[in-house]
Amino acid sequence: MKTKKITAFLLAVMMLTGIFSVGVFASYADLGEAKASFQDGVGPETNGYAIDYVYYSPVEENDSTKYPIVIWLHGMGNGKKPGEQIVPSDIALWATDEYQSRFKGSEGAYILAARSLEEKNLFWDDCLIHPLRAAIDDFIVKNRDNVDVSRIYIGGYSMGGKMTLKMAVAYPEMFAAIFPICPAWLPGTSATARLADIPVWLTSGVTDPLVNYFSMVMTTWNNIIAKSNVKADCRFASLKNVLYPDGKLTESGHHSWFAVNYDMFSSGNGDYPSSKLVDGNGNKVKLTYPDGVISWLSGFTSDFDGTKAADGGNSEAYGSGASSNVFATVINFFKNLFAYIFKG
């Protein structure tokens, strides 16, 4: 822990003096090393499936610190074999010293990147909800001396964003905050009611060609906020253009996870390019470097005590999506489009 405090202090000094003005790229240079620091793990077989994962551990020798866990869930096609789930995104940046230092109260966190069993043609299907919970429970037991069970966070992109929402709906007591990115699921009102006390940070690209911003993502946000008891704590990040932190276009408007991977800051440590951030009351939110997504996450705790799940969770709730009625979808699309145009 002493090493982590020294590292955090040096990073703070460098940021204040301007030495670290290109912090994002300094971290990016360490990305390969960060990915190599992840270890392999696998959960117990549950309902016929065992979820494997790779994880980063912040624990040092003789370390008694309690660290939060960040669960990261990949998108479709990014989990064909073990270890592949951290390759398409830059989530490994969160394992670097700079990003680890942003976790409030611990100056570090476990990063657990789980894998959907795509070789079985499973893309975060509902049948993996309980096996994923079992893998998380097992990880907590194996690392009980250093896990802060009151600070478990979950996020992911595309199909992983869908699974983020479904896990939170199935087990709302477990997660202190969640951060779905371009989630490929439109939860119904019975589902979003179960998220009422969970802070949610939703991120999406306005031009997303796969998960439509206006008919899917904005409607998901509206449904969540309509039921939320913590509106002021919720965040909605909209990316007019989906860019890398240096302002260059990503390969697709679907790739909004890079903004989250870089903690919503540009290469110059300013606002992430082409982004807009609001809270659940519609108020614009200004981020001040280095307090981005990580600082937001780590500021929340839950009452979860680490008790293992006794069953498959609330299957009725996590299976309930919003109506697929075409007319309703079209209405939502234009309602949200006009709101975006006229309200900004």
Label every model-predicted segment.
Residues 5-24:
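Sec-dependent N-terminal signal peptides of Gram-positive bacterial secreted proteins and lipoproteins
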Residues 203, 207-209, 215, 226-340, ...:
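C-terminal catalytic histidine-bearing segment of alpha/beta-hydrolase fold enzymes
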Residues 84-85, 212-224:
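Short alpha-helix in the alpha/beta-hydrolase fold that links the catalytic acid
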Residues 73-80, 116, 140-141, 157-159, ...:
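Cell-envelope and extracellular/periplasmic
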